[in-house]
Amino acid sequence: MRVADFTFELPDSLIARHPLAERRSSRLLTLDGPTGALAHRQFTDLLEHLRSGDLMVFNNTRVIPARLFGQKASGGKLEILVERVLDSHRVLAHVRASKSPKPGSSILIDGGGEAEMVARHDALFELRFAEEVLPLLDRVGHMPLPPYIDRPDEGADRERYQTVYAQRAGAVAAPTAGLHFDQPLMEAIAAKGVETAFVTLHVGAGTFQPVRVEQIEDHHMHSEWLEVSQDVVDAVAACRARGGRVIAVGTTSVRSLESAARDGQLKPFSGDTDIFIYPGRPFHVVDALVTNFHLPESTLLMLVSAFAGYPETMAAYAAAIEHGYRFFSYGDAMFITRNPAPTAPQESAPEDHA
């Protein structure tokens, strides 16, 4: 299966660079999996597609202000993007500088703070901060907006590039399908008899990395930490028992649930995953999906194609472009019910790299 099969032309004007005034005011494109039928709605119309007894699974990761600016003790400027918090003082980070810092060298952080470069691990640098990492980031860090939002971060991004239910700090990118939900909508979902459960997947900067191979099967995903608790496993089992649907809010929720159901049975899981879901791979847990519009040739678009079917997904994206939907993190959303017999661009039998 070719990566090029997942390309499309997107007008620059459709890239959402700022959030709308209200979270819930986004548009919603619905895609019926069994028929491929599309409907153009508002995000609040999602309530009409939910049934009493359904279970919605959200990712409660919290985005940390992971971008820092500073300089080496020798004077050269640099930019740090924290990829993973290792403990209270140490992180793995991407460092952009004219010359990479050497082990043992000091880094002075703009706004106050100091770090030592401990070691290099392939493309990532292990840094040790003199003070606790999370309070330091809250004090002087910048929100790590995706590269396609080509503007400096603003104060409003601290609130809007964060879900209202975010709890567990550790992500360097938002689980963006969740950005459309405000507290009144969450309450309306509960009032309809829909249950909710929360997984955690700390989204890494690798989510924005392009696929650099020609054949999908040759791609290896970056690793991210996730946790699916026994409470989530029990909630899914109860949903199945009452005949409800498991609705994942975001591709990270899909990847969490499917990572914890490797053998077809959902079990508690805590640890790293590099699961890569693309057309031909079965889904063991998820029945419906809320998701944003994703980048061309991205692994997220491949996941959606695996769920909805390749021709149906590409037709939906063409319709979204024609109707002026806003794309990517601050953009509009889709509600997709699973295609029971999805087709791929060409025959392929993927291996599960999770």
UniProtKB/Swiss-Prot annotation:
Reaction(s) catalysed (UniProt annotation):
7-aminomethyl-7-carbaguanosine(34) in tRNA + S-adenosyl-L-methionine = epoxyqueuosine(34) in tRNA + adenine + L-methionine + 2 H(+)
- Gene3D superfamilies, per the entry: QueA-like
| Parts of the chain that traverse the membrane | none
Top EC class of this enzyme: transferase
Look up the domain of life of the source: Bacteria
Q: Where in the cell is it found?
A: Cytoplasm
**Pathway note:** tRNA modification; tRNA-queuosine biosynthesis
Q: Which Pfam families match?
A: Queuosine_synth (PF02547)
Keywords annotated in UniProt: Cytoplasm, Queuosine biosynthesis, S-adenosyl-L-methionine, Transferase
* Entry keyword annotation includes Transferase: yes
Biological process GO annotation list? queuosine biosynthetic process; tRNA wobble guanine modification
GO terms of molecular function: S-adenosylmethionine:tRNA ribosyltransferase-isomerase activity
What NCBIfam families does UniProt report for this protein, alphabetically? Answer: PRK00147.1 (NF001140), queA (TIGR00113)
Say which family it is in.
Answer: Belongs to the QueA family.
- Provide the function of this protein: Transfers and isomerizes the ribose moiety from AdoMet to the 7-aminomethyl group of 7-deazaguanine (preQ1-tRNA) to give epoxyqueuosine (oQ-tRNA).
On subunit structure and binding partners, the annotation says: Monomer.
The protein in question is named S-adenosylmethionine:tRNA ribosyltransferase-isomerase
